[in-house]
């Protein structure tokens, strides 16, 4: 007798071993049809994701996985990657298959083939995939010995697959999945039949080196996406279109903010308007430092290699570091700011009464990222971090983390991000420090989030070897997630670099160090800002807050006068005194995403008014100039993120 416990706590008895599919069928035909896999738990072990054909031969807990579950969607995508390989082999028998994992929102599969695939090939492959899916062929799992599997794949000319299998220990069973005439290596699980794969689309072609090594053959990578429903896929494709429209690289060029060029790969050439935007972000964060007990510091750009060896960076990060030599000494260009802050802490002896001690820096860092990974401002080689480090005692951890989270939430709101996801990464197997210290640190992080009303996920084992951390992920205007801020507990670096304070018993102790950043890379954050706002920066951030346009030459003097008045009050304003038609001026400045366009003619000059237009179709008509000044002051003071038709709106 086998007893199956379902997620609602109900139990079902079966006379003998039973498959996941049979359990689903016994519950109802609807569930049986929707079942993609099962999540089985035996004897309180970790749940195991299995095929619907998996036979349960002892008492267990079982959850039926359908397309509505996150695991179900991953299963669909993984199985669609295999369907892609099946279709490619059907159309191009000489192609060799390699690997095909699930990635965010889809999957890819790498192939070796004698000629490059074309967009027309992609269309043919997708059509073949749909044909194979309609055949609804059963997907079956088979277990082979390693040597038999290697021999088989060599015999059919699949040398890459044979190489992968040969690297698996000889005593391990190899699982293969067969659908129709196609068989592939995979741990599984997979959908029960190809007919479960109804909604998919091939997206693009790219190159990828075998095993990520540039000395190996360049393979052809086909990317695809797959979804449970057509509505979900349509929403995703619409999001991609919107993301392309908002691409910060295009907007940066169109709005004359910055550019990139081959002579400085991964580095940014800031234009005047772009640098003005940068300065607004930096000045805002500088005020955040000042108002929240941080002391701003500045550490050197390059430091002797001996220091990077002490911190462990040279052993673990040297491939990403730039180095230089002078007078027979080797220096490392800093990839991060923390070692410099410890040196500043170590420059004097600190009492426990001085803690927590908070340092902040707009630290310029350089990392030798692979050229293929560079992506506009989102992945660069030179960047500036709003980096901060807090030196505190173990007892101060929770308060510091709670205060930081509350501060971070306010900063994100001011920049227009209202949805934040929270994740706590806990102790890995390899770590330093006692379990007691880890317990205390992890509890402090979780309690700090609870105190600030945050729901959070736990990522077991994803903390660094030197301490747990909280990751803060932003959700932007089109639903994308951006991992941004972090606060990381560090038990290691203070000890490695000899940081000490004197406790209440006159004993020297190593402080706990908290690495924290709110924006992270300012370059990346500004790229996110541009895309979140589609280039239409709110008035408090906009490089140009208003443009004053004269309708004709007689009103040019008044336009120049009020422009000067606004500039003297600290606003970023330009005058457009050209002899162009006013409709052309308005259109040009609207395309430049200027928050306010002030139109003035003879009537406005006589009455001391301005006709106010703005983003989003705003048209206030003619209002007193002083009223506009008050409105703009309110926009800046409140950091209002949308130009509102009603000046009283927030």
UniProtKB/Swiss-Prot annotation:
Read off the Pfam families from this record: HGTP_anticodon, TGS, tRNA-synt_2b, tRNA_SAD
Cofactor(s) essential for the protein = Zn(2+)
Q: Which domain of life is it from?
A: Bacteria
Q: How is the cofactor bound?
A: Binds 1 zinc ion per subunit.
Which residues make up the binding site for Zn(2+)?
A: 338, 389, 515
Cited PROSITE patterns: AA_TRNA_LIGASE_II (PS50862), TGS (PS51880)
- Record's subcellular location: Cytoplasm
UniProt GO BP:
threonyl-tRNA aminoacylation
- Catalysed conversion reaction: tRNA(Thr) + L-threonine + ATP = L-threonyl-tRNA(Thr) + AMP + diphosphate + H(+)
**What's the main place this protein lives?**
cytoplasm
EC number, UniProt record: 6.1.1.3
GO CC terms? cytosol
Region span, Catalytic: 247-538
Q: Where is the TGS domain?
A: 1-66
A GO molecular function term, named singly, is:
threonine-tRNA ligase activity
What protein family is recorded? Belongs to the class-II aminoacyl-tRNA synthetase family.
Quote the function comment for this protein.
Catalyzes the attachment of threonine to tRNA(Thr) in a two-step reaction: L-threonine is first activated by ATP to form Thr-AMP and then transferred to the acceptor end of tRNA(Thr). Also edits incorrectly charged L-seryl-tRNA(Thr).
How does this polypeptide assemble, per the annotation? Homodimer.
This one is known as: Threonine--tRNA ligase
Q: Which organism is it from?
A: Bordetella avium (strain 197N)
Q: What is the lineage of its organism?
A: Bacteria, Pseudomonadati, Pseudomonadota, Betaproteobacteria, Burkholderiales
